[in-house]
Amino acid sequence: MKKALVVFSGGQDSTTCAALACREYDEVHAVTFEYNQRHAIELESARAVGQALGLTGHEFIRLGPLLKGTSPLVSDAPLGQYASAAELPAGVEPTFVPGRNILFLTLAANRAFCLGTGDIVIGVCEADFAGYWDCRQVFVEAMARALGEGIYGDANAIRIHTPLMRLTKAETVKLSVEVLGERFEEVLALSHTCYAGVRGGCGRCHACILRDRGFREAGVPDPIWKFRKEPVSL
């Protein structure tokens, strides 16, 4: 029986990865982290999406204030607001939380070991325009080797799958449509991406700008737009 563990935030990317895993594995488990993030509403979305997908198991791990940094996601720093993708800052986005994916993947590997699987799925993407160092394929491969050596004594024992790594946001939208089919609107409407923690998205934070652009470029209305305070169109 094939098992996989998904690092699952309840956002667009991890929802797509979880749906894809459900198609490819017999059992799909997920782990979601609470780290005092500003957008804690994503925890509710993670629970709702997990139930909608019928995940075999779903664990919520409370990290509390363990992760610190200057990122507005885990501090009182102001969250950047932008009118369009053209205004997004170059380099590493200020929302970067140092060590976040290192910690998430380490704990995920621990849980995967307990489940008897070496397959971990995570929705990181190099085309995400945020410049996060821990979303690059070179980082993921290094983590897989280190975790494999540290947990199994075998650098190849843990496989960290990154199905969205080379995809644009528009391509991720199209993949979601393909994988979820008739359930696309139902499931994606439950997802949450906005860093400001606004249901349906604030439309101005880094995450909202990229999600909106991806759906527009794909020519697909985002199911969460119906919750947006201001009307959104393609």
UniProtKB/Swiss-Prot annotation:
Cofactor note: Binds 1 zinc ion per subunit.
Pfam families: QueC
Ligand binding (Zn(2+)): 194, 202, 205, 208
InterPro entries: QueC (IPR018317), Rossmann-like_a/b/a_fold (IPR014729)
E.C. number: 6.3.4.20
UniProt binding sites for ATP: 8-18
Pathway(s) per entry: Purine metabolism; 7-cyano-7-deazaguanine biosynthesis
Class in the EC hierarchy, top level: ligase
Known catalytic reactions: 7-carboxy-7-deazaguanine + NH4(+) + ATP = 7-cyano-7-deazaguanine + ADP + phosphate + H2O + H(+)
GO process terms (BP): queuosine biosynthetic process
Record carries keyword ATP-binding: yes
Keywords: ATP-binding, Ligase, Metal-binding, Nucleotide-binding, Queuosine biosynthesis, Zinc
MF term (GO), any: ligase activity, forming carbon-nitrogen bonds
The protein's required cofactors: Zn(2+)
Entry function: Catalyzes the ATP-dependent conversion of 7-carboxy-7-deazaguanine (CDG) to 7-cyano-7-deazaguanine (preQ(0)).
PANTHER family: 7-CYANO-7-DEAZAGUANINE SYNTHASE
Family the entry assigns: Belongs to the QueC family.
Protein name: 7-cyano-7-deazaguanine synthase
Protein's organism: Gloeobacter violaceus (strain ATCC 29082 / PCC 7421)
